[in-house]
Amino acid sequence: MAKKTNYVKNGKEYYRVTVTIGRDENGKLIRKEFYGKTKKEAEAKKEEYLNGIRNGLNVDFQDVTLGDLMHTWLFEVVRMSRKPATFVKYEGHYRNYIKNSELYGMKISIIKSIQIQRYYNKLYQQGKSSKTIKALNNFLKTFFNYAVDEGYLAKNPCTGKKIVIPGTPEEKIETEIETFSDEEIKKIKEALKGHRLKALFLLAFGTGLRQGELLGLKWTDIDFEKKELRVQRMIKQVTIIDEKGNRKYKTIEQIPKTKNSIRTVPIPSSLIPMLKEHRNRQREEKLKAGSVYLNDVEKGYVFTTELGNTIDASNLLKTYKKILNRAGVPYRKFHAIRHTYATKLFERGVPLKTVSELLGHSNISITANIYTHVIPKQKTNAVETLNDLFI
């Protein structure tokens, strides 16, 4: 039974209510104290706490801060269970927007939607975009789901219609996707003549593969007879972050982004001879390098360094920029090649569903949201219409 006594703290008199909530691992009783200016106030705090326990909340839910729980979640749960890129993204949100914010030291049990909303409004007034705040909200929503599951919160303050992402409708409109014109593609082709990675860039234009998917492609994934390739892995440069925030970079092989990303993509027939020529070049590089060459030119990666190492994203980007500069074509992100592939298919009458499958999007609505002009046609024949770009 709870014990009630008058209590003096800092010269002021309070009512104190003590309740026993169980025993620790050593058998010692666990007690919790509640204070109020009146007995009724102290009792109300006790009942609020006990109701939380009855509803499945953790016994120490009132003592844990958002910052402490988020750090534990990030470094002991997310880092061990999610892809490295996801952890890096989440750690960035934590470091840039939570660690030094007013939310960090707040007891997680008292955080309400209005406090989150005020913080978002403040960020917007400081110049942060709606897109940035929306990404932060998605991050917090995921974290608070964990907090609910672990018994530190009864409900997620970021779900439902409680939170409004600040910003004008005009700001929320996506910017137009970047693509290359037919004339620019011709200039890039010209700049690629004699380049050892010519096949990589033209295959990107001809298949729409993501950068990591191109780098993860192996010779065993290519069927020269059927003129198609199989996407089933990707090479990615990831950031490894320890609990102190120290960073190092590593190139890894991993499975594609989603289930639909694992797919078969037809290769325009005009690119087949170029791929065979690239393979012969790779064989020559192996002979020249001798025992230090690391790749298997029959079963290994299609695109490597001259010594057979995997190509990391940063080095590929440098090469890409040099090629655009040599071609006299304004810089666009590497992903613009993928957008160009999709746009050219749409221009040639390929249906939305087919383009979505070729791109490996997780659902057709993603494709529809990115590309707006769509007309029907057939898959393999559709890709063959790209041949004129390479002749």
From Swiss-Prot:
It comes from the Bacteria. It is found in: Cytoplasm. Residues 64-148 form the Core-binding (CB) domain. Transmembrane segments: none annotated. PROSITE patterns: CB, TYR_RECOMBINASE. Its main location: cytoplasm. GO terms for biological process: cell division; chromosome segregation; DNA integration; DNA recombination. Residues 175-384 form the Tyr recombinase domain. The keyword Ribonucleoprotein does not apply. The keyword Cell division applies. Belongs to the 'phage' integrase family. Site-specific tyrosine recombinase, which acts by catalyzing the cutting and rejoining of the recombining DNA molecules. This is Tyrosine recombinase XerC-like.
